[in-house]
C-alpha cells in the first residue's frame, strides 16, 4: 500500500487504522527554528475530533496529539517530526456482522479485492479516522505559513443536503458545530441532520476553503500545477466526489469576457480563476470548494454480497456521522495548507534567485 504520503519537500506520511492502537504521522521538510508545541496542533484537532456534538458521530476520542520527535526546547530542529494519537474508544464488536459481508458504498469490496484481506473494524485504513493525522500535520504548515507570510487558510460549510447558506460571517463559523458562517442557516442544518438521524439515512455537503495572502509564483507547471495538486489533495479526503477551483463547474455556462480576470496597475479586477493562473498562484485569494457524498453508513438495511459471493442484506451498526461534511472543514483546511507549504519550499528551492521585473500588483 504505497499511497500513504503526500508532498515532495514538505512530505506527510501517515499510518494507522480506525480500531488499531493509534495513528501516526511523519512530517518531513519543516524548516528549523519554528516555535512549535502540541497545543499548536491540538487547536485544529479539537475542531475535527468526534463526539463533540449531537450532529456528528458519538465515538468519543480525545485525539490528544503527542510530538515524539523533531522538536527540541520548543523549536523545530529541521529533522522529521513524529506525531502520535492514541485510539481510546473503539467498539469493534459493532462490526462483527460485516466481517463476511461488504457494506454497499464503502471500500469493503474494493479493499478485499485489491489486498485479498481487510480490517473490517470501523473500515480499517479506509476510515476517516486517519484524517486526524492530516489535521495535525496541516496545523504545522498553517503555523509556518502564517508566521512567514501572514497566510491564512480557513473554511466554512456552504451546503448540507438541500439546505444552503446564503451569507458568510467569519465570526459565526466557530460558533456552531457546522462551521457555517450564516447564522440563519444553522437552525435549518440542525433540523435536517436531526431528521436524517431519525430516518436512518444521511446527506452530502459542500464546503469552501480559502487561502489568503498567498504570494505570487507558487506552482510547478505542467504536471504539478498548484491547482492540480490541490485537487489531488482534496480528492484524497474520504467521501469527496468533486473539487472546484475558483468558479469551478459554473464556468461551463460563462463567457470569456466575464471570466478573464482583467488586470490594472491597481490590481486584479476579478478572481474567477480562484487565485491560480496557468497552475501558478497569482497572489489573489485561492478559492477551493469540495463536495462530499452522503455517507453509506446508515441504519437502513441494504443489499450486498458476502465472501461466498452470495446475495444477502446488511445493516450497518456502529457510530457514524449523518453528514460527514460537518467535520470536514478542518480536514480540507489542513490539506490545502500541506499543498501550499510544499509548493512554497519547492518554489524557494528553484526560484529563490529570480528577480521579478516589477512588484506584484494588488490581489
Curated annotation (Swiss-Prot):
Coiled-coil zones: none
InterPro entries listed in its UniProt record: Chorismate_synth, Chorismate_synth_AroC_sf, Chorismate_synthase_CS
Keyword NADP: yes
Keywords, in A-Z order: Amino-acid biosynthesis, Aromatic amino acid biosynthesis, FAD, Flavoprotein, FMN, Lyase, NADP
Residues that hold NADP(+) according to the record: 48
Reaction it catalyzes: 5-O-(1-carboxyvinyl)-3-phosphoshikimate = chorismate + phosphate
Quaternary organization: Homotetramer.
Name the record gives this protein: Chorismate synthase
Source species of the chain: Acinetobacter baylyi (strain ATCC 33305 / BD413 / ADP1)
Amino acid at each position: 500500500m504505497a499511497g500513504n504520503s503526500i508532498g515532495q519537500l514538505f512530505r506527510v506520511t501517515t499510518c494507522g487504522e480506525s480500531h488499531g492502537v493509534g495513528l501516526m504521522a511523519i512530517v518531513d521538510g519543516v524548516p528549523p527554528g519554528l516555535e512549535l508545541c502540541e497545543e499548536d496542533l491540538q487547536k485544529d484537532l479539537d475542531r475535527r475530533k468526534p463526539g463533540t456534538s449531537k450532529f456528528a458521530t458519538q465515538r468519543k476520542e480525545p485525539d490528544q496529539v503527542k510530538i515524539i520527535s523533531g522538536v527540541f526546547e520548543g523549536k523545530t530542529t529541521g529533522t522529521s517530526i513524529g506525531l502520535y494519537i492514541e485510539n481510546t474508544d473503539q467498539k469493534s464488536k459493532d462490526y462483527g456482522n460485516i466481517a463476511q459481508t461488504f457494506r454497499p458504498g464503502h471500500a469493503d469490496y474494493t479493499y478485499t479485492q485489491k489486498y485479498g484481506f481487510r480490517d473490517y473494524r470501523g473500515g480499517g485504513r479506509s476510515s476517516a479516522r486517519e484524517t486526524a493525522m492530516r489535521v495535525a500535520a496541516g496545523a504545522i504548515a498553517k503555523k509556518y505559513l502564517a508566521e512567514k507570510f501572514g497566510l491564512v487558510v480557513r473554511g466554512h460549510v456552504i451546503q448540507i443536503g438541500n439546505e444552503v447558506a446564503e451569507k458568510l460571517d467569519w465570526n459565526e463559523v466557530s460558533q456552531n458545530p457546522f462551521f457555517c458562517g450564516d447564522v440563519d442557516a444553522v437552525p435549518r442544518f440542525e433540523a435536517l441532520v436531526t431528521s436524517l438521524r431519525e430516518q436512518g439515512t444521511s446527506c452530502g455537503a459542500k464546503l469552501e476553503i480559502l487561502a489568503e495572502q498567498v504570494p505570487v509564483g507558487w506552482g510547478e507547471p505542467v504536471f504539478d500545477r498548484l491547482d492540480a495538486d490541490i485537487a489531488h489533495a482534496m480528492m484524497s479526503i474520504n467521501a469527496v466526489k468533486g473539487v472546484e477551483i475558483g468558479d469551478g463547474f459554473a464556468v461551463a455556462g460563462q463567457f470569456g469576457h466575464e471570466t478573464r480576470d482583467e488586470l490594472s496597475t491597481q490590481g486584479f479586477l476579478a478572481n474567477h480563476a480562484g487565485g491560480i493562473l496557468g497552475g501558478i498562484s497569482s497572489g489573489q485569494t485561492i478559492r477551493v470548494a469540495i463536495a462530499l457524498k452522503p455517507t453509506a453508513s446508515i441504519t437502513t438495511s441494504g443489499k450486498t454480497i458476502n465472501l461466498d459471493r452470495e446475495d444477502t442484506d446488511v445493516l450497518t451498526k456502529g457510530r457514524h456521522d449523518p453528514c460527514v461534511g460537518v467535520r470536514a472543514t478542518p480536514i480540507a483546511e489542513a490539506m490545502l495548507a500541506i499543498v501550499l507549504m510544499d509548493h512554497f519550499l519547492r518554489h524557494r528551492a528553484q526560484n529563490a534567485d529570480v528577480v521579478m521585473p516589477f512588484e506584484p500588483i494588488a490581489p
